[in-house]
Amino acid sequence: MFKVVVAAAALSDGEYTEDSVLPGPAALDLPLTSATLPNHDDVPCSPTGEVTLKQAMVVSCNPAFGDLGMKIGADALREQAAKFGFGDSPSVPMRVTPSSVPAELDAPQLAQSSIGQYDVRVTPMQMAMVAAGVANRGTVMSPYLVQSVIGSDLSVIESADPTELSQAVSPRVADELTDMLVATVDEGTGTKAQIPGVRVAGKTGTAEHGEGRRAHAWFISYAPADDPQIAVAVIVEDGGVSGSETSGGSVAAPIAKQVMEARLK
């Protein structure tokens, strides 16, 4: 799920496109350590051991994004995250815990951070802002909870004033991200968010958070992809009651689908 932020940084850099080729082995050897960054189930991301950036997003290839994060660098990753709102504590009107990317990262830590692990901290609101920002062709809006307050006579006492927070990515980059996220739902890890007759853009996330604990299942999405009406972020802590099958695609994506369907009816 945080891979969307990494891809945004890479595409904005100008040196990468969705067709850029990245390593996709079963496990990525990390510098400065004997540790590796494994892919899901310790299998390669493709038969050739290489993937394009788009393919890496579709199958959520950990080694590819770990390698990409190390190549673009910690500063670029933090700057891109900040453009989406990381580090801010917005008022909605109550204060919201800020999301964060660690300030100091060596190469192995940067690789782990690039798949949303190590010490990356995000809230559901922040990831909803990422989804909405991409859906809005790069423009991130300031969040709020209440659209309007209406009196007993149905007159509007107070209403929210939508304001732009930042331009996280260019419209071109947002369109490229949308293309990748639609493919993720059409044919990748997010198929359980598919809605008949609607193009859905989405990204799974499976966040480990301690030895012996089941992963948090995440999913972010927006729809319709060509004319977005809703953006969603779902987290199922500890995978809910999913048993051993805990992943964003299997647990959180169906919930996001139901939320989007309810809005689009």
Question: Residue ranges of each PLM-predicted region?
Answer:
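Beta-lactam-recognizing serine transpeptidase/beta-lactamase-like catalytic domain environment
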Residues: 5-238
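Short, gly/Ser/Thr-rich active-site loops of penicillin-recognizing serine hydrolases
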Residues: 156-161, 180, 252-265
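A short acidic/glycine-rich loop-to-helix N-cap element
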Residues: 236-251
